[in-house]
Curated annotation (Swiss-Prot):
Residues 60-79 have a biased composition (Gly residues). This is AT-hook motif nuclear-localized protein 23. The PPC domain mediates interactions between AHL proteins. The gene is AHL23. It comes from the Eukaryota. PROSITE patterns: PPC. InterPro entries: AHL15-29, PPC_dom.
Length: 292
């Protein structure tokens, strides 16, 4: 029965069962039992059960070797039980970790709101803050009341005027740079309004005592470049040619004590150079406040 088709056999048996002249009887006597009669009478339900059982064997892989056809289609069972490929649904919607910047750029400007308490020197407080934090401070504005103000007015031929009493701050601007910046790079300009409506202003050269809470709006930075303008022709040629100083002194003009001005340099505030920067070459140092 190796080449027997199950479908053809089923149709043949079904046709034989529906013949009126053919009847299958079960012989109960043990003497007439044939080798094939032990299965009982053959019906359509038995054929359906056999087909269903064989279909289950084919789907499950047919590893028991019950029939040649079931074993030949063993690979089809693997396709039925295989996991689907690709991402599981919803895997792309998982929350991503936030991006955290742990290091700040040296060229970043930071905004500050500085509050000076009553009785303190506003100029000295801001200068000390810039020196300890090793950051350059650019004062944008200020508000509050001050007393005992010493200012220098350009219209009075550099005379220093000391104002007694309480004054309201109208405008406050300036810059504070820690070393190695020269003292001339630090200055503070203020305009005040008196109790009788008078307005006076100038560069702060002495004490600027706060008569109450003084709020200073400022921005800070760490990367500073000092340059002397206008640029000379030889300096422009050196910059165009890539520079010819070699690996010698980083500040040749400063070390030699010449009056050519400060060369370009760009150093972090926490790096102290090994040379002394000239102070006399900067204008406005004679009438200003002393260094930090």
């Amino acid at each position: 029965m190796a080449g027997l088709d199950l479908g053809t056999a089923f149709r043949y048996v079904n046709h034989q069962l529906h013949r009126p002249d053919l009847h299958l009887h079960h012989n109960s006597s043990s003497d007439d039992v044939t080798p094939g009669a032990g299965m009982g009478h053959f019906t359509v339900d038995d054929e359906d059960n056999n087909n269903n059982h064989q279909g289950l064997d084919l789907a499950s892989g047919g590893g028991s070797g019950s029939s040649g056809g079931g074993g030949g289609h063993g690979g089809g069972g693997d396709v039925v039980g295989r996991r689907p490929r690709g991402r599981p649904p919803g895997s792309k919607n998982k929350p991503k970790p936030p991006v955290i910047i742990t290091r700040e750029s040296a060229n970043t400007l930071r905004a500050h709101i500085l509050e000076v308490t009553n009785g303190c020197d506003v100029f000295d407080c801001v200068a000390t803050y810039a020196r300890r934090r090793q950051r350059g401070i650019c004062v944008l504005s200020g508000s509050g009341t001050v007393t005992n103000v010493s200012i220098r007015q350009p219209s009075a031929a550099g005379a220093v005027v000391t104002l007694q009493g309480t004054f309201e701050i109208l405008s406050l601007s300036g810059s504070f740079l820690p070393p190695p910046a020269p003292p001339g790079a630090t200055s503070l300009t203020i305009f005040l309004a008196g109790g009788q409506g008078q307005v006076v202003g100038g560069s702060v050269v002495g004490e600027l005592t706060a008569a109450g809470p003084v709020i200073v709006i400022a921005a800070s930075f760490t990367n500073v470049a000092y340059e002397r303008l206008p640029l000379e022709e030889d300096e422009q040629q050196q910059q165009l040619g890539g520079g010819s100083n070699g690996g010698g002194n980083l500040f040749p003009e400063v070390a030699a004590g010449g009056g050519g001005g400060l060369p370009f340099f760009n150093l972090p505030m926490n790096m102290q150079p090994n040379v002394q920067l000239p102070v006399e070459g900067w204008p406005g140092n004679s009438g200003g406040r002393g260094p930090f």
